[in-house]
């Protein structure tokens, strides 16, 4: 896949972890559109502001979808690569 090119996450580059905000979702990663379950990974000094904005812009995801998302994230990498 991708002619052998390997993805290098921005946050893994020296000096970038404290300057990177990673945003992801189950909808895109596992092809379950409409679930609206996602997350961010950010430095502590930024994540507080993200949580404040999130409180006013979104509603909570249904509990069964959160449980399904946790199960999907715990799946082996082989499951994910089969989706590609």
Language model segments and positions:
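Catalytic PLP-binding core of fold-type I/II PLP enzymes
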Residues: 1-6
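Conserved core segment of the aminotransferase class I/II
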Residues: 13-84
């Amino acid at each position: 896949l991708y002619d052998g090119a390997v993805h290098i996450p921005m946050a893994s580059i020296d000096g970038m972890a404290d300057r990177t905000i990673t945003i992801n979702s189950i909808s895109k990663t596992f092809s379950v559109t409409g679930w609206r379950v996602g997350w961010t990974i950010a430095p502590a000094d930024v994540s507080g502001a993200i949580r404040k904005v999130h409180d006013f812009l979104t509603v909570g995801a249904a509990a069964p979808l959160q449980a399904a998302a946790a199960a999907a994230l715990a799946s082996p990498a082989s499951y994910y690569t089969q989706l590609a």
